[in-house]
């Protein structure tokens, strides 16, 4: 009997897969699913937390992800015309496109890129039920669905598409870059690894016993929610600004004040579904970060409580086209609006989306 090698095993697996496909072809015909957007109610007025630019054109657009969920986005396009490099932007975790992601997108459009800022599935103006739930799989797919949309626009060069994720969507962006070879450049700004923080707590303070108790509590909540016929919200930020911890006060300063409050933002209001964290606990986002071949830029604030997420993610990345930039004096939310290093981000995308 001949010894199996990795090559023969791969060939065997491929043969088995093709055999299954052939068997399926002989069975009763099944019509392929069509991509059908659901009707969304989109606002017509400018309701962002930042001023509208006179240098770019703006319009509302929609696209559909691989799970059939229709996503809503703001498109920002330079008024110069021509074929553009394009960037899809989303985040922070619990925010909407009218907040930080829209500011990133509009500013990068002023610098020559066609951009979209989208609401993730189940949030903002995007579709999907139940509302206010997060998923490491579906929300990673949201980025790839944005690439689907951009790659099929006549004014976008499909070989020049990048993505930018803020806060929790920074980790999603890295996961998308590991899976989607069409993505040529990725920026993760002030990133969270949502799998890590949900499974281990802040600063990895949660042990196995703590995880067990958390799972127990969340699964009991599932039963209660099902009995009640509705999903309980975890609650957003407190009504009054907390004295500590400082990073929660920083969040409050953005989401609960005129600086960043928005009526559709989960963080500005009732928060996520309580059980949303369950899927993140057992599904690590950065498993294949070391296999990302395209360019990656990690940006984080020097004084951010979350800085360790970017520093540890950077250790996983391989290749000379990966970089980590620490913004002096910046905390986590400073990179939502106040201290975003747009020159650095522009130079990165200009270099790798040629």
Where are the regions that the model predicts?
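Conserved alpha/beta-hydrolase
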Residues: 107-127
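Catalytic histidine-centered segment of alpha/beta-hydrolase-like enzymes
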Residues: 330-339
């Amino acid at each position: 009997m001949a010894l199996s090698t990795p090559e023969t095993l791969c060939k065997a697996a491929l043969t088995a897969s093709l055999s299954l496909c052939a068997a399926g072809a002989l069975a009763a015909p099944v019509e392929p699913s069509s991509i059908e957007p659901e009707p969304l109610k989109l606002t017509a007025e400018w309701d962002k937390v930042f001023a509208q630019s006179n240098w770019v054109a703006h319009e509302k657009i929609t696209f559909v992800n691989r799970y059939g969920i229709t996503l809503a986005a703001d498109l920002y396009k330079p008024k110069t015309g021509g074929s553009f490099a394009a960037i899809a932007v989303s985040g922070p975790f619990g925010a909407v496109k009218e907040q930080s992601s829209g500011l990133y997108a509009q500013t990068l459009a002023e610098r020559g890129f066609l951009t979209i800022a989208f609401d993730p599935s189940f949030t903002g103006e995007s579709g999907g039920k139940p509302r206010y739930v997060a998923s490491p799989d579906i929300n990673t797919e949201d980025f790839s669905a944005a690439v689907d949309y951009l790659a099929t626009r006549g004014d976008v060069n499909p070989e020049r598409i990048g993505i930018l994720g803020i806060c929790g969507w920074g980790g999603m962006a890295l996961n998308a870059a590991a899976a989607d070879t069409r993505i040529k450049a990725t920026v993760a700004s002030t990133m969270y690894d949502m799998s890590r923080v949900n499974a281990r707590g802040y600063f990895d303070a949660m042990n196995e016993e703590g995880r067990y108790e958390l799972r127990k509590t969340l699964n009991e909540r599932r039963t209660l929610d099902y009995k009640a016929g509705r999903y309980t919200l975890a609650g957003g930020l407190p009504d009054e600004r907390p004295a500590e911890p400082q990073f929660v006060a920083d969040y409050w300063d953005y989401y609960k004040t005129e600086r960043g409050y928005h009526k559709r933002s989960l963080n500005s209001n009732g928060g996520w579904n309580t059980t949303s964290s369950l899927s993140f606990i057992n599904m690590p986002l950065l498993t294949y970060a070391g296999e990302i071949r395209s360019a990656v830029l990690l940006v984080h604030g020097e004084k951010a409580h979350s800085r360790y997420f970017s520093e540890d993610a950077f250790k996983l990345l391989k290749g000379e086209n990966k970089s980590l930039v620490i913004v002096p004096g910046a905390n986590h939310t400073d990179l939502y609006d106040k201290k975003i290093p747009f020159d650095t981000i522009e130079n990165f995308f200009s270099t790798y989306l040629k």
